């Protein structure tokens, strides 16, 4: 999915607004995903997926850091996320549908926290961004 100049600006501006809350919001999104789509817990049998757990917070930080890297490399996501793509394809073997679940839960979480700043334009741009990241992370599955 191609991000337009407006999408890139929306993503960068929104990520700047999120600032130091990225790990917290992503952890909340993960909790939403595990609650709404319990089959996603399959890939996390080795950690405590209960709401607010240290494991959820730690994984939220990992995902937030990866997304922050992606925001900084919007023009070359495949290179920026290459190692992470290898891990998801060859080691973790996460079913690609789970990325869609997480994307949805992240959008819901961001909408709740950003309020009026979560405009239809921001929503669309973030949706495209998360879909682009997911596409890169699943690109090496073949």
Curated annotation (Swiss-Prot):
Modified residues (Phosphoserine): 4, 36, 50, 125, 132, 139
Phosphotyrosine sites (modified residues): 25
Binding site for O2: 59
Binding-site residues, heme b: 88
Expression tissues: Red blood cells.
Statement: the UniProt record of this protein carries the keyword Chloroplast: no
Gene3D superfamilies: Globins
Spans through the membrane: none
Record keywords: Acetylation, Heme, Iron, Metal-binding, Oxygen transport, Phosphoprotein, Transport
GO molecular function, one term: oxygen carrier activity
Record GO cellular component, one term: blood microparticle
Domain of life according to the entry: Eukaryota
Modified residues (N6-acetyllysine): 17
Biological process annotations from GO: hydrogen peroxide catabolic process
Globin domain residues: 2-142
Phosphothreonine: modified positions: 109, 135, 138
N6-succinyllysine PTM sites in chain numbering: 8, 12, 17, 41
Function according to Swiss-Prot or TrEMBL: Involved in oxygen transport from the lung to the various peripheral tissues.
PANTHER family: HEMOGLOBIN FAMILY MEMBER (PTHR11442), HEMOGLOBIN SUBUNIT ALPHA (PTHR11442:SF48)
Family: Belongs to the globin family.
Subunit details: Heterotetramer of two alpha chains and two beta chains.
Name of this protein: Hemoglobin subunit alpha
Organism in which the protein naturally occurs: Cavia porcellus
Gene (name only): HBA
């Amino acid at each position: 999915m191609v991000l337009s100049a407006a999408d890139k600006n929306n993503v960068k501006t929104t990520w700047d607004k999120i600032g130091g809350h990225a790990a917290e919001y992503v952890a909340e999104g993960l909790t939403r995903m595990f609650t709404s789509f319990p089959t996603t817990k399959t890939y996390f049998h080795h950690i405590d997926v209960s709401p607010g757990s240290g494991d959820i917070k730690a994984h939220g930080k990992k995902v937030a850091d990866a997304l922050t890297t992606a925001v900084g490399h919007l023009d070359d996501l495949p290179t920026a996320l290459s190692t992470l793509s290898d891990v998801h394809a060859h080691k973790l073997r996460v079913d690609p549908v789970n990325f869609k679940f997480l994307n949805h839960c992240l959008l819901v979480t961001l909408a709740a926290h950003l309020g009026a700043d979560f405009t239809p334009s921001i929503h669309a741009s973030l949706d495209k961004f998360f879909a682009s990241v997911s596409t890169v992370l699943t690109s090496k599955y073949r």
